[in-house]
Amino acid sequence: MKKNKLAFVDVETTGIDHEKYEIIELGCILVEQNWDAAGQPEFKVLDEFEFKIKPERIEQADKVSLKINGYNEPDWLEALSLPDAMRIFADKTEDAIMVAHNVAFDFCFLAKAFSLTGVTNKMHYHKLDTISIAFAKLHLKEGVDRFSLQFLCDHFGIENKKAHTALSDCRATLELYKKLMQI
């Protein structure tokens, strides 16, 4: 039986450009994926966590982005510094394959954060993107004309109660991944 450790990751940010904006929330669910003798996937959640991260340049934030992800100063008073968050994240995700919905977006922000803090990224170099997997499996399916996390959650009947919060989006991405692996 082949085992893989997967890190379902989501970042919430102060804008969409990783060169200009910063991470304000980081969520992760660590999962062991096994394949049984019949080739069916099995999933075991090992850990899950979410950090609010103190923004250093909140005055430069995109107001629309802050509204979407629900940023408000009082909720971030006890937030971690970026270096502290990245150290914990790196230790917890060691050797895990990163999985995200639009993995390039999340990884660009993480790579910048690792660089800024001097923390070493310990994740496996392979990454999985649920948008790419969904496109490969569903692009010819009638009625599937978008690949946003919300659209695909609706399509598969996955509830995402707190969309655009890091841990909730991680949970939705994990459930989406499970559905896609069944196809």
Q: What are the functions of these language-model segments?
A:
Residues 2-109, 124, 150-158, 164:
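Conserved non-catalytic scaffold segment of RNase H-like nuclease domains
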Residues 11-14, 130, 173:
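Ser/Thr-centric signal marking residues that sit
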Residues 16-18, 135, 175:
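Conserved protein kinase catalytic core
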Residues 128-143:
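Short alpha-helix plus adjacent loop in nuclease-associated cores
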Residues 154-155, 161, 167, 171-183:
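Acidic two-metal-ion nuclease catalytic site recognized across multiple nuclease folds
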